[in-house]
Curated annotation (Swiss-Prot):
The keyword rRNA-binding does not apply. It comes from Pseudomonas fluorescens (strain Pf0-1). Coiled coil: none annotated. Keywords: Flavoprotein, FMN, NAD, Oxidoreductase. This is NADH-dependent FMN reductase SfnF. Involved in the dimethyl sulfide degradation pathway. Catalyzes the NADH-dependent reduction of FMN. Its EC number is 1.5.1.42.
Amino acid sequence: MSRPLKVVALSGGTWRPSRTLVLTQALLAELSGHLPIESHLIELGDIARPLGAALSRQELPAEIEAELQAIEQADLLIVAAPVYRGSYPGLLKHLFDLIDLNALIDTPVLLAATGGSERHALVLDHQLRPLFSFFQAVTLPIGVYATEADFADYQITSEPLKARIRLAAERAAPLFGTHLKPLLKIA
């Protein structure tokens, strides 16, 4: 690979501090240990008000349009969403409603989510995966879900979560024809 991968990570939470942001940053950091990347982090909370006020892409301020273009031009997307009342936030869906229908075809997407308990873990497979299937993106088979119990003071403390983050990054690396560390083996 002659250039670093353009990795765009979208943290779909609107509040700070944010476990979703911490998880997104951990995924980016782990991925950077396996692949040469150029990362761009988008925090939904930072663009929430102007994004929410736009009913069409033509109404977006230039800085928000630039963020959508970054998503559309990514070599790899990381999309992490908090789970509220059984689903990802509506504003996150609104953002993807403004993405060009063909822009994400064959783009690998690493899915992640955070929620209050394990009962929301299926949001990865039952809500986020179908969203990106619509765009004909390639959702990676390993998603990462974290609960409040996996964090202390907005730091990841759970060893199983750390292992899942490592596994997700290691499984993503071969898609780009290179990997720097041997893959984890699951018994």
